[in-house]
C-alpha cells in the first residue's frame, strides 16, 4: 500500500515536470533535528560522501531539482544508517532509511527515528 502511495506521488511530480527536465546536483541541503536537545541545523551533504549526525551516517546517492520554468521541487535518494555508539568501524550499521525524500512533501517519505529527524531542504544549483 505504501509503495502505491509513493508511486502515485512520483507520477504526479513527473506529470507536472517531464522526467528528463530534472537537473542533477552534487550536493543537498538537509535540515537535521536532535529531538533530545532540540538543536536544529542546516547541513550540506555531498554526493557519495557519508556525513555523520549523532549516531546516524547519512549518504546522498542522488539529488535532482526542477529548472526554474516548472514548479519548484527537489528530490534526493538518501541512505541513512544508525551506527550506534561503537568506536570500531566493523560495528553493525543498521539501515534506518533508504529511499527518496522530497523537499515539498517531507511527510510522504521520511525518516522515522526516536531521536533524530532529517528533512530535505534543497539540492544545490
What residue spans do the PLM features occupy?
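Sec-dependent signal peptide recognition
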Residues: 1-7
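N- and C-terminal low-complexity/disordered segments
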Residues: 3, 16-125
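Hydrophobic core
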Residues: 8-14
Amino acid at each position: 500500500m505504501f509503495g502505491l502511495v509513493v508511486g502515485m506521488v512520483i507520477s504526479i511530480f513527473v506529470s507536472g515536470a517531464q522526467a528528463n527536465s530534472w537537473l542533477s546536483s552534487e550536493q543537498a541541503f538537509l535540515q537535521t533535528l536532535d529531538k533530545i536537545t532540540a538543536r536544529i541545523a542546516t547541513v550540506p551533504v555531498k554526493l557519495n560522501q557519508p556525513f555523520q549526525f549523532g549516531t546516524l551516517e547519512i549518504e546522498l546517492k542522488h539529488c535532482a531539482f526542477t529548472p526554474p520554468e516548472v514548479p519548484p521541487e527537489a528530490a534526493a535518494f538518501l541512505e541513512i544508517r544508525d551506527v550506534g555508539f561503537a568506536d570500531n568501524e566493523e560495528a553493525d550499521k543498521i539501515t534506518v532509511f533508504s529511499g527518496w525524500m522530497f523537499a515539498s512533501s517531507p511527510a510522504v517519505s521520511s525518516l522515522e527515528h526516536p531521536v533524530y529527524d532529517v528533512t530535505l531542504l534543497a539540492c544545490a544549483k
